Amino acid sequence: MAAKFLRRALVACAATLAVSGLVAAPASADLQKPSQQWLRDSQAGLFLHWGMRTSPGYTSCSAWEKAITDGGWDPAYWVTEAEKLHASYLVLASFHSRLGYSRAWPSKIPGSCSTKRDFLGELVAAAKARGLKVILYMTNDAQWHDEGGHEWLDSAGYSKYKGKTVNLDSQDGFGQFSYDNFFEVMKNYPDLGGFWIDNDNAYWESHDLYQQIYQQRPDYLLSNNNEDTPIMDTISNEQKTGMTPSYDYPQATYTAMPRLTEACFKLPDTGSWWYGGSNSAVNKMLNIGRFITNSGSSIKSLMAETAMVNGKFPSNQEAFNNFAKTYLDAIWESLGGTEGAGYMYGGMQPGFWNDGAHGVITIKGGNQYVHVLTKPSTSTLKIRDNGYRVRRVTNLRTGAAISFSQGGGSLTLSGLSGWDSYDTVFKVETAGRTGTYDPATVTLKASASASGHGGQSASDGSYLTYFDNNKTLPVNLDYDLGAAKKVQYLGLNQREDSVSYARSDTEQSARIKAYKVFVSSDGKDWGSAVKSGTLPSHRGVQFVDLSAVTARYVRLQVTSTYAASSDSSRYKRLRIDETWVGSDYATAAG
């Protein structure tokens, strides 16, 4: 589905629901709002942890501020470095529980360090002048109030200001203090992009903070860290590790499109989020890989760098930024303005390819961009084409034509050599999609389903609806083609609302494991299975290939999924966004 079409569909859907009274402001999590569009159009952001405890560390607010100014801090430097990373926004984290709760802006609210110079305001203005946004980090947490043996919060000062006793070292007291700060910031910074929230506070929730933010600043965005909170615009996924390959960050995410999703990770992948005095190395392959794989799933890469007191980055991070600018410039056609392919936006199958190859695909209009991050052990690359007819393939960097063929459901690139060290990009020009039956002509019934998520929800052409098996296994999905027709394969996009590997006993994949396929002429007599097997626990579109048969009815019987019983929320759970019947494999467009 083209991105423009999706946007129109989402806006129309939101409008319809609002008129019918089914949606209260703000819109539900899975619906797009105009205020989100700039973030949807972006690929990356720059995360800045910078406060009083930035090395060498200060306990005096005025001494910290003087050191910043004396060091020559300039907001334009951060904006320039963000642009090198092709970032569209910056997230400033100075009011952080581990950085002394330092507010890098003037405030009339006592309670923690607040500077006289308006560093936040200067950054917002500098970013706006160059078309970037600034989002402000807000912490929920008082637990680090005395870190390092120094008390960072001033309960007496805040109590006097409020005219009552408030203990800022408690979660409730800190909730009041930070709540007041939200409103002061909203009043003073209309050009701010929104708030990046490091988890909820009960005081905020009981006082309807988020609803009030949207009412006062409807253009602000709200992001929550590691929690998919429906009222928020974005969920951010912090520093995920343990994937194979290690750069494939989306394997550890669990939020289905079109929800805005962000991956926040440290560019020096070891050490603190803030500058602790060292010039840590930056792993090019890991971080370029993270950037590319996130883009291949329409996930925003929020990359953290460790600014020193004067705002400058250590030399290894500056060097990486310079490298990233040149490197990404050369392939930006394959990233800017694209969506991840193999999901709701259409496209070929990403992920695990032949002979050890691994990568993702991005899509823009009729062009798809194959990003090979791990090359195959041979000179051939084979990718499931998902019915797209290919007319031309070129090396994006050189423009050289690539030899290719299509058949059996796959696009095969041959005679490949000269692989890039990080990401070899092939531009695949397509001539439409073929060989699948229109979902409008297929009736899909399920033997079990959760309320509101019946079988037809997975065959209605919309990724805003989905089938849910109500944790019932085995479960049958019966396709009725209306008449006896050729059946070559089944395709399906499972809902990407679980990780794709077992991150822990309680965080596992809710994808199809074992299945059987049956066919019938009357929908009653199914006979023996014509195919049985397992699907991999991988993200993106998946396929069940059959020896071509002619039948009116096809049954996909799912007998097991990957999540173990230790993951009670996902055990036996199956959700499918869309599934379809393929009549023929695609051939090259010539």
Provide a role label for each language-model segment:
Residues 1-29:
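Secretory targeting and sorting signals
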Residues 30-299, 303-323, 327, 332, ...:
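Glycan-processing catalytic domains of CAZymes
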Residues 324, 435-460:
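Predominantly extracellular/luminal regions of secreted and cell-surface proteins
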Residues 359-361, 398-409:
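Extracellular/luminal ectodomains and secreted, surface-exposed scaffolds of diverse proteins
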Residues 361-366, 374-387, 430-437, 459-529, ...:
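Aromatic, loop-rich ligand-recognition surfaces of beta-strand-rich domains
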Residues 384-399:
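Solvent-exposed beta-hairpin/edge-strand motifs
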Residues 397-404, 524-531:
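Surface-exposed loop/edge segments in extracytoplasmic proteins
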Residues 407-436, 552-554:
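C-terminal beta-strand-rich structural cap/linker in extracellular carbohydrate-active enzymes
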